[in-house]
């Protein structure tokens, strides 16, 4: 292990395991002073994280670092504080249509980014979606994801969560992005009913048709792309979605400005002071030029 890699690993102090196997651990970054998640993954999953580590999306954890130490592959990612959809539904009951659609659109935004890199998530489930303090749905866990290969006839590794995994994940065909659309239909139904489709399917509004199309056994009969699914879902809650997206516009712009990217309060305060001083200087320069011109 070289000195730089050793230094990077040394700054992450392990707090507690987040999985039974101990491969996912809550850590504290002693330099940035923030909680993060450390994962030990296999070589294939490491490749997937490398493919998405430059994605900036509000609805999935930010990849902080990818570290290879001999035969060990380590991912450091943002820690998302909140409750899972599974927990919330079991504790408080099914969501309203407005709430469910809002969350599904958030998750859809994350999947759009993932699918754009030819990656299939394969585990879109209530346990892998966290509702954060800003009431956003965050999609977690790429630990059984796969890169989409067009020439394969079926998945070589059978993985997934019963009740949400597509038939393809059980070896009937190759899993592509339509497998995630199947899971999204199952997830939407769970949010609205509190049950898996096999026990109860949502029938109150036209969302029944959206869910039914998404969860077709034959992938050819499903939505072809996640964008198509989201468009149909959005039709049942358009006003709220438009309002939310407009309200997030300034936040998204600010997120890309220096001082706001890490979401640390002290950095935001310093940035605001500096930006104000900069704008004040510009104002004074323009004002004095106008005065001089008039004289």
Regions found by a protein language model. Give the residues of each.
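ATP-binding glycine-rich loop module of kinase domains
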Residues: 11-50
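Conserved HxN/HPN-centered segment at the entrance to the catalytic loop
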Residues: 56-65
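Conserved short submotifs of the Hanks-type protein kinase catalytic core
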Residues: 70-84, 88
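Activation segment signature within eukaryotic-like protein kinase domains
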Residues: 103-104
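Catalytic-loop of the protein kinase fold
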Residues: 115-131
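Conserved activation segment of eukaryotic-like protein kinases, specifically the C-terminal portion
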Residues: 154-168
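Conserved catalytic-loop aspartate of Hanks-type protein kinases
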Residues: 180
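Conserved C-terminal C-lobe helix
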Residues: 203-217
């Amino acid at each position: 292990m070289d000195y730089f890699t050793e230094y990077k690993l040394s700054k992450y102090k392990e707090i507690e395991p987040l999985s039974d196997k101990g491969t996912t651990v809550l850590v504290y970054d002693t330099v940035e002073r923030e909680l993060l998640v450390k994962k030990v993954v296999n070589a294939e999953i490491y490749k997937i994280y490398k493919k998405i580590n430059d994605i900036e999306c509000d609805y999935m954890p930010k990849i902080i670092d990818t570290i290879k130490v001999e035969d060990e592959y380590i991912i450091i990612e943002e820690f998302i504080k909140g409750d899972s959809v599974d927990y919330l539904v079991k504790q408080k009951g099914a969501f309203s249509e407005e709430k469910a659609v809002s969350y599904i659109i958030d998750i859809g935004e994350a999947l759009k980014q993932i699918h754009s890199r030819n990656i299939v998530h394969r585990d879109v489930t209530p346990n892998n979606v966290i509702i954060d303090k800003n009431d956003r749905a965050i999609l977690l866990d790429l630990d059984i994801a796969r890169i989409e290969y067009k020439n394969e006839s079926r998945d070589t590794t059978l993985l997934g969560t019963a009740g949400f995994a597509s038939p393809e994940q059980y070896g009937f065909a190759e899993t592509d992005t339509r497998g995630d659309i199947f899971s999204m239909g199952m997830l939407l139904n769970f949010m609205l009913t509190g049950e898996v489709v096999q026990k109860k399917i949502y029938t109150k509004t036209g969302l029944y048709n959206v869910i039914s199309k998404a969860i077709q056994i034959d992938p050819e009969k499903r939505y072809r792309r996640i964008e198509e699914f989201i468009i149909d879902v959005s039709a049942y809650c358009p006003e709220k979605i438009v309002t939310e997206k407009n309200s997030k516009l300034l936040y998204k712009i600010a997120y890309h400005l220096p001082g706001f990217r890490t979401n640390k309060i002290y950095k935001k305060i310093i940035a605001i002071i500096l930006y104000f001083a900069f704008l004040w200087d510009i104002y004074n320069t323009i004002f004095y030029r106008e005065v001089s011109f008039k004289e």
